[in-house]
Regions:
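Short polybasic amphipathic segments
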Residues: 36-42
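Negatively charged, low-complexity tracts enriched in Asp/Glu with abundant Ser/Thr
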Residues: 1-34, 46-89
């Protein structure tokens, strides 16, 4: 579970970076009532990335870890792309 907690922290940190360091909007929602985890990144009100994990508490640990790693990697890729844009111009 420590690995999953670390991944949650990384995802939240990346969402915070998008929100305060860019003109992108981010949200991370963990809804215990609906048993889901949802991450979204938007630019100018249009979805750029979203991922939803339904039946969160019923997921096997390794599958959940795989999905959280995929989310973190996707957000890191978007962050890297944003940082490279000024260098390309």
């Amino acid at each position: 579970m420590d690995t999953n907690m670390s991944l949650f922290n990384q995802i939240n940190s990346l969402a915070y970076w998008f929100l305060f360091q860019t003109n992108y909007k981010s949200s991370v929602i963990f809804d215990a009532d609906k048993d889901c985890f949802f991450v979204t990144i938007k630019k100018s009100g249009k979805p750029l990335y979203s991922h939803r994990i339904s039946d969160f508490s019923k997921r096997k640990t390794r599958l959940l870890q795989f999905e959280l790693v995929a989310i973190a990697n996707s957000l890191l890729h978007i962050k890297q792309t944003i940082r490279q844009k000024p260098q390309m111009a």
